Structures are given as C-alpha cells and as structure tokens.
Swiss-Prot record:
This is Ferredoxin-type protein NapF. The keyword Iron applies. Transmembrane segments: none annotated. Belongs to the NapF family. The gene is napF. It is found in: Cytoplasm. [4Fe-4S] cluster 2 binds at residues 80, 83, 86, 90. CDD domains: NapF_like (cd10564). Binds 4 [4Fe-4S] clusters or perhaps rather 3 [4Fe-4S] clusters and 1 3Fe-4S cluster, leaving Cys-113 out of the cluster ligands. Pfam families: Fer4_7. InterPro entries: 4Fe4S_Fe-S-bd, 4Fe4S_Fe_S_CS, Fe-S_Ferredoxin, NapF. [4Fe-4S] cluster 1 binds at residues 48, 51, 54, 58. [4Fe-4S] cluster 3 binds at residues 113, 121, 124, 128.
Length: 176
C-alpha cells in the first residue's frame, strides 16, 4: 500500500504519516544510524518487526524509536559500548555476526568547534575512550583537534560532551 492508494478512513486516522515514514525508510532516504552490526538499511527495514527488544536492553539508552518505529542510535543520549545486547535480543536476521566491525561510522568535527574560534576546549578528547582525538599545539593560538580515524571506533562518546554540538558521526561507506 502506498500513500496514493491509502483508504480515506486510514488517511483520516493519521496512517499517512506512518506510511510515508516507512516508504522513506525503504527508499533508503534514512540518514540516521542503525544499531551496531546492522545489515544494509533496505534489508533492515524489510525484516525489522519494530518490537523494541533491542531498545529495552541497550545499557546506555542510545537506541531509540525513530521514524516509523525503527530503532536508531542517538549519541546525544550517550555512547555505544558495543556490548552486543541489542544483537542478542533481536530474533530477526538483521545483524551481521559480532566478530565483524560494528559499523563504519567515524567522527566529524564541524567548523562550529570552539577551538576553531580560538576558545580552549578539549571535552571530546577527554571523553574519547579510544584516544582517537588529540590536540596539536599552535604557536600563539589554541590547540587544534586531530583525529586518528584508524583508532576511532565510532562509539560516539565525544558527541555528548561537546558543548556546541560540533561533533557528528558519519558513515564512511556512504561517503565513498
């Protein structure tokens, strides 16, 4: 069923918004982050039952119900510890084996970073458990962030601590 052939009664009950979100998710317009070890988005959306089992076991509460009820990662709630409980709780075949990399997300620091405006801040470095963020001293200026992308595991610990929301996680596979 598409939005075009949605019965009038369901339209009036608000079903069009859920259906529209579902169609956008299936067309891979989704720009959020799925749980670690998730399969490609089109397969994920087709197989996920939106039961919420993965949400209830997430120890850091970063998994939330997103568009059309599908689980998404919100790093502003915390970081991913890669505990794998979401994978273990799911009864559907929507996850890769846990011996593979959990995802290809890496840190991206925007131009709103305080250090780029000559304001001292190192909260991202302080919060990074992988020590992937370092600061290079500048002669007569404020130290600038340097990211070791090989060390960054995409856990998102740096996101929550940033006072100006200058940090996001980007999927390197989508940028190739």
């Amino acid at each position: 069923m598409t939005v075009e052939n949605l019965p009038r009664r369901q339209f009036l009950r608000g079903k069009f918004s859920t259906l529209s979100c579902l169609e956008n998710n299936q067309k891979q317009n989704f720009v959020g982050i799925r749980p670690p070890w998730s399969v490609e988005n089109s397969i994920f959306v087709a197989r996920c039952t939106r039961c919420g089992d993965c949400l209830s076991v997430c120890e850091t509460n970063i998994l939330v119900k997103g568009d059309a009820g599908f689980p998404e990662v919100r790093f502003d709630n915390g970081e991913c510890t890669f505990c794998g409980k979401c994978v273990d709780a799911c009864k559907q075949p929507i996850f890769y084996p846990r011996d593979q990399l959990p995802w290809s997300h890496k840190i991206d620091i925007s131009v709103s970073c305080l250090t780029l405006h000559r304001i001292e801040c190192r909260t991202c470095q302080d919060n990074c458990p992988a020590n992937a963020i370092r600061f290079k001293l500048q002669m007569g200026g404020v130290a600038q962030p340097l990211v070791n992308f090989d060390a960054c595991n995409g856990c998102g610990a740096c996101v929550q601590g940033c006072p100006v929301n200058a940090i996001t996680m980007n999927d390197l596979k989508q940028n190739e």
